[in-house]
Amino acid sequence: WITLDGPVDAIGIETLNTVLDDNKVLTLANGDRVQMSGTMKAMFEPENLNNASPATVSRAGIIYVSETELGWRPLVASWLDTRPKAEAAVLTSLFDKYVDPLFHAMKMTCKPVMGGAPWEHVSRDFCQVTTLITLLRGCLRSHEDEKGGKKESLSETYYEKMFLYCVTWSLGGMLQASDRPKLSKRMQELGGASAPTMAASETFFEYFLDEDSREWAHWESRVPEWLYPHDEETPKFAQLIIPTLDSVRLEALLGAVTSVDKQALFVGGPGTAKTTAIKQFMA
């Protein structure tokens, strides 16, 4: 199989028309002819056929998959196939329990920082579940040995707490501060005993899952004490970095994402320390 998963280019696709014929001969621009074997097949995975000519379309069978039909479940199923069966069974039930109800709650009551047209929620849901998988991989990585096997067995309760922690920042990471309590309330209703015990004014965003105790802990416990730099006579105010709850949890999330070789995007207005947080993490 030759799989071409890029866009259909109007010029490049014309050279492949002869390959799609019964004779399967590729004619290059310099006049060379390459004969394809009878067992070779070509498959195209473009986003659309805007630049495809009728000659190309008539030579290929077309399978159209709507984004509204695909959803996030095939993505999750593909990832769970790479996990141990016992773990995959637990995670499958957690995806079924939380993802769709939380998406529904967010669509009804919340507004993300990066909004879009009403139909764009499909792609956004897909991206948020991708982020959820990335954070789960980052959290599970600390419980795996060098060969990817489990160092120790994890309880279903711990899996659920870990899932709630990852859901907080994957599905709720782009919410306005005023909308976070709405998502947190719905997560508490679904999580039950697996949710942290918190004050009425607090949300899931103030808590993380401690890997040693396997219990919820407040992010304030991770904020180091800041000491004034007495070794400098006149410290430069613009260069002083004082650890806060926000900076500590952003650094922890960056660590989880980069540990599985993924990228992160910080969203926020000017002057919210996005660049400073990344530079501090890279230092």
Which residue ranges define each predicted feature?
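A short helix-turn-beta junction within AAA+ P-loop NTPase domains corresponding to the substrate/partner-engaging
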Residues: 21-25, 52-81, 86, 283
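AAA+ P-loop NTPase catalytic core
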Residues: 1-3, 81, 95-283
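Intrinsically disordered, low-complexity regions enriched in proline, serine, glycine
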Residues: 12-13, 28-29, 53-56, 72-75, ...
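Conserved catalytic/switch belt of AAA+ P-loop NTPases
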Residues: 1-45, 67
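Core residues of folded domains in eukaryotic genome-function proteins
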Residues: 22-24, 30-32, 38-42, 48, ...
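The conserved Walker
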Residues: 8, 60, 270-271
